[in-house]
Amino acid sequence: MNEFSSFDQPVMMKIDKIIDESNGTKSFMFRHKLDYNPGQFVMVWLPGVDEKPLAVSYLSDDFFGITVLERGKFTKLLHTMVPGDQLGIRGPFGHGYSFPDNIKNGKGSVCVIGGGCGMASVTVLIEKLQDNNPTILMGAATSTSLFFKNRYKDITLFTDDGSEGIKGYPTDVLEELHNKNGYDIIYTCGPEIMMSKVFDFCKKHNIQFEASLERYMKCGIGVCGQCVCDGQMVCKDGPVFNLQALSN
């Protein structure tokens, strides 16, 4: 049974370990089992401050982790916490990434694209797709914003300023890579301008496409309506949407 299944009451969890991933980015590890599908999210509660949705970026049989970029009051306070401190966890919630029949059991050609802190949404997905030997592309503004770059043996890095990896964006090489690998599906999470370019590319080449969208979420279960986007509740219908849903 998933002990975090409560919709409205967070379970207080002790931070087991904290990893400094890169400049301004930390991962918080919890030694508990989580029944989680890649692309779902958990609501993280900092008592007396706020509650925010965060992707699960580490997952094993007996622990899970979330990765947090410091960029506001909530995350700044989160970054002051130390092992032994507690956070409230609700979830997991939402519709995650799917695995079509044509890529199951190591079949099919797969590409995963992460941009900036969106990389946290696709890490568990990448690990689940290891039998497919996926193409992994990661982009960030500068080298100091790249995290998880040493987590995978085969990963192509991009930076806007050329400080590490290829200067430019992951979308710059999609045409060349698709001509070589013939992708059956491309998964992505990151800045919407990047995901929009991947969407257009997949639509043009008739490639299956799934993207994780970021919206302000308050309840996580489709009640408050804060995350509605064109009639879709991102917390419940998403945060992952396929090409057909986004086309509509």
Model region roles, listed by residue range:
Residues 2-85:
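Ferredoxin-reductase
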Residues 17, 58, 157-159, 211, ...:
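Structural signal for conserved beta-strand scaffold positions within catalytic alpha/beta enzyme cores
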Residues 73-216:
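FNR/FR-type flavoprotein reductase catalytic core
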Residues 199-200, 204-210, 225-248:
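Iron-sulfur (Fe-S) cluster-binding segments and ferredoxin-like electron-carrier domains
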